[in-house]
Amino acid sequence: MKGGERKVGMREGAPEIAGVLGRGSLVSVSARIGNDLTGYVCDHDGTGLLLDVRDPNGDPTGYEFLPWSSIERVSVEEV
């Protein structure tokens, strides 16, 4: 590439939803009510996402089911 040119397209090895939301994936979720949760994916289906939620120290705090309609954004740790 010459100066000023950009490489177009997605990065090689970009993840797929099935992989990043697979059981055991670490994610951070922003809910529409203003809560941000971090945890490990237990399961997901057409209704929502089940997380094993962790506090800022990484300690488990319980399980949370989040309906898709309540989720604003899901951030995934680099895979």
What are the language-model segments listed below?
Residues M1-D36, L50, N57-V79:
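Short glycine-rich, low-complexity segments
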Residues D36-D43:
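Short beta-strand-centered aromatic/proline hotspots
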Residues D45-T47:
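Ser/Thr- and Asn-enriched, surface-exposed coil loops between beta-strands
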